[in-house]
Amino acid sequence: MWGYVHLISWVAIVVLTVTALAIYSKSTKGFTILQMINRIFYILVILSGVMMVQYSVEQSWILAIFKILMGIIVIGVVEMLLSYRKQQKPTGMFLMIFIIVVVITVSLGFYLSGGYPLFN
């Protein structure tokens, strides 16, 4: 069950982040609402990740620690990306880092879980 919560939360974070970036110029209030909803999903990701960490450590404790660090970095990059957007500063570098770090984190997550819950 925690695998599904984790996966859905990560997908929601990515979708909400991209949506917030896209609507900022049209609605700063909508942007702020999406940013707050994103933060709720951070809590779900952290909670579900803590519940699943024992399975990842069994697979490879080094990769599990690296994935935990990458997950924290993703959350930090999302926050920087959204705050730079709100301050109307250039976000290109953070967007590129966001894409790279998300791909690495998702790849590690599926490797450590053996593809669960997407590939049973």
UniProtKB/Swiss-Prot annotation:
Compartment list: Cell membrane
Assigned keywords, A-Z: Cell membrane, Membrane, Transmembrane, Transmembrane helix
Entry keyword Lipid metabolism: no
NCBIfam families: PRK13673.1-4
Membrane topology: Multi-pass membrane protein
Transmembrane segments: 3-23, 33-53, 62-82, 92-112
Membership in a protein family: Belongs to the UPF0344 family.
Record's GO cellular component terms: plasma membrane
Name this protein carries in UniProt: UPF0344 protein lwe2280
InterPro entries per the UniProt record, alphabetical: UPF0344
